[in-house]
Amino acid sequence: LDLERMKTVLQDEAEIDQRIYTFPTSSIEEGGKKISYFDYISSLKNPDCNEALKRVCSRIDLDAIHNFLEGVPELLPIQREFYLTMLTERKEKILDYSLKLLMEQEQHTSPMLGM
């Protein structure tokens, strides 16, 4: 995106959400159609993906990402804000949301301890 488009996206939650839920799409196809990351990950239908979700979520350090972006002198402030916003929103709305669903699913399907 050009700088003006980045500003527009950052000012509109619907634009941000479109970049989370609608595109980009993954290279994974179902029924000949590329699927969204959100739909695939939050479906919890792939056990390998679910295990990767558990491993990855705890390792994402948004502060470290912020510090990294701050250290790239070629980036303009609007670019830093855009990238950090998109990464933060995608983590929260795709990964954290899906992990919460997974934890709830596992809690309901595993036998209660101590009974």
Can you describe what each PLM-predicted range is?
Residues 1-115:
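C-terminal catalytic region of ATP-dependent kinase domains
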